[in-house]
Amino acid sequence: IQYLLGNLDESYLKRLREFGGLQSYPSRTKDPDAPDFSTGSVGLGAAAPLFAAATRRYVDSHFGERPHSRFIALIGDAELDEGNVWEAVADPATAELGNVMWVVDFNRQSLDRVIPGIRIVQWRAQFEAAGWHVIEVKYGKKLQAKFAEPFGEELEAWIDAMANEQYQSLFGFSGQELRTRFLDGAPAEVGKSVAELTDEALYELVTDLGGHNLDSLRDAFAVCDSVTDRPSVVFAYTIKGWGLPMAGNPRNHSALLTGDQIDNFRNEL
């Protein structure tokens, strides 16, 4: 992205993780396009903007207010397993920071497991207990529209009841295999709700998560902008590797595309 914006020389694109090349995590001392915060140690990218906002509040109250600004962090769901994140959330100094927004990339995959569904319930409760404003962007506009049709309530209930491991496994299938696995054990009403869909349309529906839908994200961000008395966190449901051949594959962490896959992806773009 930085290269496309003209902020990074093309030569760096071929030197990822090399000595003198781009780091695997943002670094203010090593990257040529200095980021706002260095990360590397998991959890720092979440906590640093939060305490920066607290510092900004102190500066404004003691030395005069500056133009309004926002402090935004994009973090992974497995990053919420880090203890320093919750220390920052619970710190009294970070309360009532209405100019803070965290966006959690909730793809349910970490390096070595699929995140259990119960975790989102626990995390939401922890944020709310600390006084945060919480939004879940779970479904895209296609699924939301489908839920409003006949048997849509049953369809939504069926998807909501699925374990993360079960739902995650669907992304690796297409055609009749996807339909069979998706409807396995489902009430008859769920089958009726998708009966008229082609296999391709069913795949697009099942994978229509809110984190990939710009309209759903815009709506959530607008709500966060209106909440000015506390920090906000947005859980954006996504598919790891979305749009790529390894999308949703449990072994896709740091996976590389083959030459043929890159050529196909380039043609699709």
Where are these regions (language model features)?
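Short amphipathic alpha-helical segments, especially helix-boundary/capping motifs
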Residues: Q23-T29, F63-R66, G98-W102, S193-T198, ...
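A general structural motif
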Residues: H68, L97-N99, D229-P231
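Structural motif
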Residues: I72-I75, M101-V103, V233-Y237
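Long, well-ordered, tryptophan-enriched scaffold segments
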Residues: F106-L269
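A glycine-rich helix N-cap at a beta->alpha junction
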Residues: L8-E18, T94-N107, A125-H133
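Cofactor-binding active-site loop characterized by glycine-rich and histidine/acidic residues
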Residues: I1-A95, P116
